[in-house]
A protein has these predicted regions:
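C-terminal tails and terminal domains of large nucleic-acid-associated
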Residues: 281-284
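Flexible, glycine-rich linker and terminal segments associated
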Residues: 1-260, 273-275, 287, 292-325
Length: 325
């Protein structure tokens, strides 16, 4: 037995293409189909990377097919659907499906119909519904999410975020995330791959101005079928900003220094610097703590307090250094 053929593609536009070919098949067995010379043609329309429609015909097997598929983005609330119809040597079958991605589960509905010919199309019908979910545990943290194939991470908010939701994914914008914390526990990222260095991205819903949630990404290298817990937020979440002036009213421009907690609980001082007009911003501050800023190796300094009830941003307005004695 052998088969050889040739085919080619022609792009009418960037979205529409035609594929055609001819082939010759010789089979030793008398039970095989598609002997001799045959031809095939297919027309493909793909308006986006998620949508594809195709019509196809093969003369050697006397088969035709027509399909349209819209792929889900796997984001929360996304919907995928499609339909395929085939006629093969007289037999006819068709299938339609839809899948939905929710925060805590995914679901698929499909309907398939078959008939030995057009007159008896619908003689066999199969309907299926599938719902997939998971309950994940990691060091005392629980989350309900979609199916987990390998490793996972549970993301939950620090208590000072006052119940705001944490999302696993790039951003809350346009639902660009895969899971969200809430009533049924932590946000579940169930798409980690074992033994691969990869980022876990996160964001916080309605985060208060000035609240420092961190880099928005943590890199991990999971062992086989492992789980992580990741708390989003910290005790040192506040940020302070203001303008620093000299006694004569001129800005303290382009100067560096250190920020030291008066309670002595910080392992290392925080960095401090001003821009060309004396503006500064300090991150990773703790509420109800007094701080001392030392400039230029301690030649000058000033102090400020972070209120105990701050939600994130502390506006220090304008600070004027005291004249040197």
């Amino acid at each position: 037995s052998y088969r050889f053929g040739i085919s080619g593609n022609y792009y009418v536009t960037s979205k529409l293409s035609i594929r055609a070919g001819v082939d010759y098949t010789k089979l030793d067995s008398s039970f095989g189909r598609g002997r001799g010379l045959g031809a095939s043609i297919s027309i493909v329309f793909q308006p986006s990377y998620r949508d594809r429609a195709e019509a196809r015909y093969e003369s050697s097997t006397d088969s035709q097919s027509l399909s349209y598929i819209h792929n889900s983005s796997n984001q929360i609330g996304s919907l995928g659907y499609g339909a395929v119809a085939n006629r093969d040597n007289g037999a006819v079958n068709a299938q339609g499906f839809a899948d939905y991605t929710a925060n805590r589960f995914d679901a698929t509905l499909s309907q398939a119909t078959y008939g030995p010919n057009f007159k008896r199309f619908g003689a066999v019908n199969v309907t299926s519904i599938r719902v997939g979910t998971s309950i994940a545990f990691a060091d005392g943290v629980v989350g309900v999410g979609r199916r987990i194939n390998d490793s996972f991470a549970l993301l939950y908010p620090h208590h000072n975020l006052d119940g705001r939701s944490v999302v696993a994914g790039q951003s809350l914008a346009q639902s660009d995330y895969m899971s969200k914390s809430g009533t049924f526990g932590a946000a579940v990222n169930g798409y980690l791959t074992s033994y691969v260095n990869q980022p876990i991205q996160y964001d916080v819903q309605d985060v208060p101005p000035g609240y420092d949630i961190g880099a928005g990404s943590v890199r991990v290298n999971p062992p086989y079928h492992s789980g992580y817990k990741l708390r989003v937020g910290t005790d040192a979440f506040a940020s302070a900003m203001g303008t620093l002036l000299l006694p004569n009213g001129q800005p303290v421009a382009l100067i560096g220094g250190t920020v030291i907690a008066e309670d002595g609980k910080d392992k290392e001082p925080l960095p401090f610097f001003t821009n060309s007009v004396g503006r500064f911003a300090i991150q990773n501050l703790r509420p109800a703590v007094a701080y001392r800023v030392e400039l230029g190796g301690g030649a000058a300094m000033f102090k400020f307090n972070v209120p105990s009830d701050t939600t994130g941003l502390v506006d220090l307005k304008t600070i004027t250094l005291k004249p040197a004695k």
